[in-house]
Amino acid sequence: MAIHLVIIDALNLIRRVHSAQPDPTDIANTIQNTCRTLQRIISESHPTHIVAVFDHLGSDRGWRAEILPEYKQGRKPMPEPLLNGLEKIQDAWWQLGIDSLLSEGDEADDLVATLACKVAQHGEKVTIISTDKGYCQLLSPTLQIRDYFQHRWLDQPFIEQEFGVKPQQLSDYWGLTGISSSQVTGIPGIGPKAAKEILSQFDDIEQAFLSPDLPKKYRTKFDQHIELARRCKRVSALKTDIELGFNLQDLRFTANETH
């Protein structure tokens, strides 16, 4: 039987469902609505294996903040009623046949990336359910990203239209432009248009920096800020080598079995 692993970016989904509610303290409604959303996702995607990956919620901002101290600094905390209701949400998802994987010190996106790439590299189909465009750098013939809320695939044509670069250049793109929502600055004075121009001429930041053909209008910026660009690229890239401690069989979708 062909394998299809569906990975739910859990907090990405939960926050969007919760923010649309009129009463943010009504966690029972959040549970009901997230379960309804997941049932539709399952109905549309027909997974053989499925898992929901959650961020750890400690004060440690992880390895990225060690490289770039301002990374995600000052980000709004999760609303307390929602934070207190996460365990109940996970229990409800378990009843649907969806187990939860909680990251411990690693960001959820690195866990998602590692799991997705390990399975996709064996030629099996993987779908990541998330609105996070950061996952687009993982795209491959067997790995796809679905933005459920916008009813669209974050695929190669989407990346071309949105960023004008190849999937494998996205971390370089963000190394140049930054990611404002995560306090990743990039090179001051280089925006999307300039990054697209640079990465249409060069494969990556290093090739551009070392080339005598880098346009003069960018040379001073690169010379002054190359180390910052390298750090921004590193924090924008997803890790795909985390030790997982389980195998694919543990994620088999068992909706019709008793939990």
Curated annotation (Swiss-Prot):
Q: Which residues form the 5'-3' exonuclease domain?
A: 165-255
- What is this enzyme's EC? 3.1.-.-
Cofactor(s), names only, from the UniProt record: Mg(2+); K(+)
Q: How is the cofactor bound?
A: Binds 2 Mg(2+) per subunit. Only one magnesium ion has a direct interaction with the protein, the other interactions are indirect. Binds 1 K(+) per subunit. The potassium ion strongly increases the affinity for DNA.
In which domain of life is the source organism classified? Bacteria
Pfam families named among the record's database cross-references? 5_3_exonuc, 5_3_exonuc_N
Q: Which positions does UniProt annotate for K(+) binding? A: L176, I187, I190
Chain residues that bind Mg(2+): D109
**SUPFAM superfamilies, sorted:** 5' to 3' exonuclease, C-terminal subdomain, PIN domain-like
**PANTHER family hit by this protein:** 5'-3' EXONUCLEASE FAMILY PROTEIN (PTHR42646:SF2), FLAP ENDONUCLEASE XNI (PTHR42646)
Q: What is this protein called?
A: Flap endonuclease Xni
Upper classification of the source organism reads: Bacteria, Pseudomonadati, Pseudomonadota, Gammaproteobacteria, Vibrionales
